[in-house]
Structures are given as C-alpha cells and as structure tokens.
C-alpha cells in the first residue's frame, strides 16, 4: 500500500516537473524594513505569487496591495502566515505597483513601495469543432447554463480565511498536461473563448486526485463543464476539475491531498476523454503549474 502511494506520487512529480524531477527555480523579492518575501516563478499574466511573513515578533500584521487588491497577512493566520496573489491571465504587461505596510507591535508602521515589471505572455490559438448544441443550447437548457454559471461564481466568491492545504500542490493526474493555459479557442469557426486551465488527456475512468487538501464546495453535473468538482483550499485558493465521468466525493466532504475525487471522462463540451484542471485565486485565473511550482513544504 505504501509502495503504491509512493509510485503514484513519483509519477505525479514527473508530470509536473519532467523526468529530471527538479522544481523550477523561484524568484524572490525581499521587502526592505519589513519581514516579508514575495516568491514566484515568473512575473507574467497567469502566474501565482506567494507573499510570506518571515519570523519577526516585532511585526504583527502586513498589508500588501497589488493590482488593485489588498491582502492582509496576520501572524494569527497560522504557523506559516502568508497569502497567495494571482496575476490574472488577462492582465496586461507593464508596470504594476506593489505597496507593503508593516504594522509593528509598538504601534509604528513601515511602508515600502516598488514598481514591478510584468512581462508579456503569449497564448496559443486553436480551432475546435463541437456539436452545435454546445454553442447554442436548446431553449430549455439556456436557463440551466446561466444558473450553473451563477452557482459556480457564487461558490468561488466565498473565501475561507484559514489555510486548509497540506504542503505543495500536485497535479491531479500523472499524465503530462497540454501547454494550453490561456489558449484562445474558436469553436466551429465562429464562437471564441479563453481557456482558463490546462487539459490533461488520460484514459476514460482514470482516477483523479485532489491537488491539495481542502473542502469540496461543489460536486455536480453541468451542461458545459460536465461533471465537476471544486475544492476550497482556503485563503482564496480553489481548484476545479471538469468533464469527469464519475464523481467520488460530494459537497461538504473534507479531502486530503492525493485522495481520489473523480474519474476522467468526456462529459459536457468535450471532444475526448480528458481532465480540465483549473486554479482560481480570488478572482484571478492562473496557470495551475505556477501554483505547483511554489515550494510550500
């Protein structure tokens, strides 16, 4: 049993980082005068930044403002206080102002500001042929599609302040993912959409693993997304799993990293057995492998 789990973890590691198994090199920005570091793979649209408070008893709270959103890091949030910041896939390249305020236990305040340079990111384009009912649903299904979209947004809008994850994130399948995050998809040569996740092709029925520990906040069957699972990992981080053939969890379940939550399928707007795996951080659509790259152990 232990050997089987070790092999599975090894395969997932290879899927994430290749046969070499090396985690990509991280970049770090240390904030002068404030015990905080910003860790990230790249400063590009679709990337994830980790803002961590370092060990310093004299600072009780840090406020971070980036891209129009304010984040609070409080020492009371756990043994590893920090926040995840997502750079949405639609973010324009160019300057992005980082403002950091450190509140000390004696009441004094330290302030730091820096202009970060967001590099451009190129996305691919793909033409896809699907059944017309997946582009223009029958009248009886249009209300269902809207209701499901509203439900998904409502679920993603509820943020859990505590961190529920266990160490670093892992891919949900051992198979290698397509490099199609942010892809501009044109269906039947007339309807376009942006692909806000990555696709992983795998045999029908292959077990899908939870990419980290958390609470199942949605497990349902959607018209376009097929059978889906959404896991809340806390602190605004959600993982999404679409087009499954079978769900192995239900809403309200607490799952551990690596647990089987579903099976690969071809449900919804899909052209073959695969898993759509997405990550949302607050309102930002980010590359799942940017989150996997972060060293959270």
Regions picked out by a protein language model, each given a short descriptive name:
Residues 207-217, 249-264:
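Short, well-structured beta-strand-loop connectors
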Residues 196, 211-248, 273-278:
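Zn2+-dependent peptidoglycan hydrolase active-site motif and core
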């Amino acid at each position: 049993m232990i050997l089987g789990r070790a092999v599975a973890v090894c395969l997932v590691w290879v899927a994430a980082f290749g046969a070499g198994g090396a985690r990509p090199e991280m970049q770090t920005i240390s904030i002068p005068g404030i015990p905080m570091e910003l860790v990230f793979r790249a400063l590009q649209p679709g990337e994830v930044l980790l803002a961590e408070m370092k060990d310093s008893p004299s600072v009780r709270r840090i406020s971070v403002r980036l891209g129009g959103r304010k984040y609070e890091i409080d020492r009371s949030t756990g043994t590893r206080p920090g926040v995840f910041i997502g750079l949405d896939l639609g973010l324009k390249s160019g300057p992005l102002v980082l403002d950091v305020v450190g509140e000390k236990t004696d009441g004094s305040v330290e302030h730091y500001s820096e202009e970060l340079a967001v590099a451009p990111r190129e996305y691919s384009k793909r033409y896809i042929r699907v059944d017309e009912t997946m582009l223009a649903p029958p009248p009886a299904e249009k209300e269902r599609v809207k209701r499901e979209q509203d439900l998904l947004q409502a679920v993603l809008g509820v943020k859990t302040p505590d961190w529920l994850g266990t160490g670093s994130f892992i891919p949900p399948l051992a198979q290698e993912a397509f490099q199609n995050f942010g892809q501009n998809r044109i269906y039947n040569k007339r309807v376009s959409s942006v692909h806000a996740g990555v696709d992983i092709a795998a045999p029908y029925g292959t077990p899908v693993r939870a990419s980290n520990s958390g609470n199942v906040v949605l497990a349902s069957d959607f018209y376009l997304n097929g059978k889906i699972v959404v896991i809340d990992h806390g602190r605004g981080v959600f993982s999404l799993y679409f087009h499954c053939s079978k769900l192995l969890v239900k809403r309200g379940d607490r799952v551990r990293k690596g647990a089987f939550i579903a099976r690969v399928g071809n449900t919804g707007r899909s052209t073959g057995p695969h898993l759509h795996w997405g990550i949302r951080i607050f309102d930002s659509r980010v590359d799942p492998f940017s989150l996997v790259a972060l060293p959270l152990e």
